[in-house]
């Protein structure tokens, strides 16, 4: 597959800034030219540019320290809002979690109808040495499905290159139904599946705007997820449902999807009174 030079923005949200010691050095090793935007969602800490430079990153950099905890969705939307307000130029955008490693930013020459580029993800489950090896050389690993496994393809927003116009359009729609989304979040007994929800919303919105829109799959690994210190709870909430996790996640995503579809339907609704002037 042919590649083309493209402008890319990488967005990272962080709560425990120590995790940036994983994600930022990984980005520093990339040969691609890109802009990094970091949103610190922990009001009790301050992340400084100097801290990021000490981790080896030398490219374009913006650091946002939030005044209060927004959560993952709010932090991601805050990054997109910052990018828009500061008119940062880009063709593509990709999110990366602070405790994961982005190992590739190559953009293939794809159709205008391809709004996202899906790739593969490596998941390190048990050994820190595997994380360090993969950070040095993402091709130097043994996928044994015990210590390291491969998700092929990786379907989600983190690690997926998305066209700038598509992700900004998604941000507009999600901001319009933010209250509905938070109400669904509060009704769940587990941590909201933000990445899955945003990916589903992106697909719904892109295909609503253009029926020809579709993601494209590139069969290479570009993302390393660390699952070593995953605990049963985070921020006071269970990471996964205790029972029937798949079904509960699917039901939650279906509820988020309804909110997105209603927002899109309301965009197309004729304001009261205007139909008389038609």
Model-predicted segments: where are they?
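C-terminal catalytic/acceptor-binding lobe
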Residues: 183-278
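Short beta-strand-to-loop element that shapes/binds the nucleotide-sugar donor at the catalytic cleft/hinge
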Residues: 116-132
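Acidic donor-binding/catalytic loop of UDP-sugar-dependent glycosyltransferases
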Residues: 100-111
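Short beta-strand/loop segment that forms part of the nucleotide-sugar
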Residues: 33-44, 64-67
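Short beta-strand-to-loop acidic/aromatic patch adjacent to the donor-nucleotide binding site
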Residues: 90-101
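Short, well-formed alpha-helical segments that are part of the catalytic scaffolds
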Residues: 16-30
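A recurrent flexible, glycine/aromatic-enriched loop bordering the glycosyltransferase active site
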Residues: 141-162
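Glycine-rich, basic loop-to-helix element that forms the pyrophosphate-binding segment
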Residues: 67-83
């Amino acid at each position: 597959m042919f590649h083309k030079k493209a402008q890319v923005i990488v967005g990272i949200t962080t709560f425990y800034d120590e995790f940036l010691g994983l994600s930022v050095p990984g980005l520093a090793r990339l040969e691609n030219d890109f802009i990094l935007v970091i949103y610190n969602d922990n009001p009790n800490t301050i992340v400084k540019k100097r801290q990021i430079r000490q981790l080896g990153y030398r490219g374009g950099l913006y650091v946002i320290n939030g005044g209060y905890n927004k959560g993952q969705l709010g932090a991601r939307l805050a990054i997109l809002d910052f990018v828009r307000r500061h008119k940062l130029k880009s063709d593509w955008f990709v999110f990366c979690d602070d405790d994961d490693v982005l190992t590739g930013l190559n953009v293939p020459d794809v159709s205008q109808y391809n709004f996202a580029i899906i790739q593969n993800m490596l998941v390190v489950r048990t050994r820190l040495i595997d994380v360090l090896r993969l950070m040095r050389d993402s091709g130097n690993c043994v996928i044994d499905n015990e210590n390291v496994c491969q998700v092929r393809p990786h379907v989600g927003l983190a690690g997926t290159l998305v066209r700038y116009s598509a992700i900004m359009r998604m941000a507009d729609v999600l901001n319009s139904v933010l209250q509905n989304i938070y109400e669904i979040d509060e009704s769940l007994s587990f941590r909201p599946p933000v990445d899955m929800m945003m990916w589903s919303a992106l697909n719904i919105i892109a295909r609503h705007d253009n029926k020809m829109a579709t993601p494209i799959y590139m069969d290479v690994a570009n993302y390393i997820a660390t699952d070593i210190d995953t605990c049963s709870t985070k921020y006071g909430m269970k990471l996964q449902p205790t029972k029937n996790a798949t079904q509960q996640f699917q039901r939650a995503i279906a509820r988020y999807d309804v909110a997105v579809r209603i927002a899109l339907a309301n965009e197309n609704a004729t304001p009261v009174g205007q139909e008389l002037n038609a």
